[in-house]
Amino acid sequence: MALLVRVLRNQTSISQWVPVCSQLVSVSPTQRQWSSTSQWLQKNQSRVCLGSEQTVGADTAQNRKYHNTSKLLTTQDFPQPVEEKVGPFTKIIEAMGFTGPLKYSKWKIKIAALRMYTSCVEKTDFEEFFLRCQMPDTFNSWFLITLLHVWMCLVRMKQEGRTGKYMCRIIVHFMWEDVEQRGRVMGVNSYILKKNMALMTNNFYAAILGYDEGILSDDHGLAAALWRTFFNQKCEDPRQLELLVEYVRKQMQYLDSMNGEDLLLTGEVRWRPLVEKNPQSILKPHAPTYNDEGL
């Protein structure tokens, strides 16, 4: 008590209360030993906890650094056609309706386009289409068959960038020139021919749109497009539709297997038969040879 009174009189600071008060309570040697031991355990536990937290943090950082999640494939992950780099001057020229510089000279592309359209007309077995699809041997039937093959060529050549698109325009130009020339040879009146040409032009763009939608969808969509355009909604035998869908699919596969550079330079296309006798031959296309000697 005397010690407590002395402390109060001297107004000992708070920091001095702890050692002073510890003298008020008698502590045995055993308790002192346990207190020192508990303090040592607490210090070691705190060090261990800090070490474990640091270790866990390091492991987590390491795991976050080297952990790879499974990536879902999207359309952008697959190989896409490389777009041509076009300068601003070329963009301005093409926006005005002119054709900018191309990969090859225009006269070579025009010759290749003429050859490709000629292959659509001369290398197609029209008699087989007339027989198996039960089509009348008329000018309209010829136009529908030619239109189908020209469309397949357009789909293939559009994959070859700006040069391929320019070639597509030339192919369509040669097609309309041929249609007009055949109409005159048949003796069709010029007024009626002009009227029919306008009607066929509308049907052409409608058919291209329908075929594009059909080739990008399943066989049902392609069959519907062929039924509307090729058969003029008059096909009653589903086997004819099945045959034509199979023909378009295998022909597009065959065209895709051809080298784009060869097609741009030669324009030579080999058409598969309507009824395939050797399906394995589709995977082995013949490479055309380019020869511009004398041109």
Swiss-Prot record:
GO cellular component term, pick one: mitochondrion
Record localization: Mitochondrion inner membrane; Cytoplasmic vesicle
BP terms from Gene Ontology: mitochondrial respiratory chain complex III assembly
Tissues in which the protein is found: In the brain it is restricted to the olfactory bulb, the hippocampus, the piriform cortex and the Purkinje cells.
Family classification: Belongs to the CBP3 family.
Record-linked PANTHER family: UBIQUINOL-CYTOCHROME C REDUCTASE COMPLEX ASSEMBLY FACTOR 1 FAMILY MEMBER, UBIQUINOL-CYTOCHROME-C REDUCTASE COMPLEX ASSEMBLY FACTOR 1
Function per UniProt: Required for the assembly of the ubiquinol-cytochrome c reductase complex (mitochondrial respiratory chain complex III or cytochrome b-c1 complex). Involved in cytochrome b translation and/or stability.
Summary of subunit composition and partner proteins: Interacts with UQCC2. Interacts with UQCC3. Forms a complex, named COMB/coordinator of mitochondrial CYTB biogenesis, composed of UQCC1, UQCC2, UQCC4, UQCC5 and UQCC6; stabilizes nascent cytochrome b/MT-CYB and promotes its membrane insertion. Forms a complex, named COMA, composed of UQCC1, UQCC2 and UQCC4; activates MT-CYB translation. Forms a complex, named COMC, composed of UQCC1, UQCC2; UQCC3 and UQCC4; mediates MT-CYB hemylation and association with the first nuclear-encoded CIII subunit UQCRQ.
Protein name: Ubiquinol-cytochrome c reductase complex assembly factor 1
Organism: Mus musculus (Mouse)
Primary gene name: Uqcc1
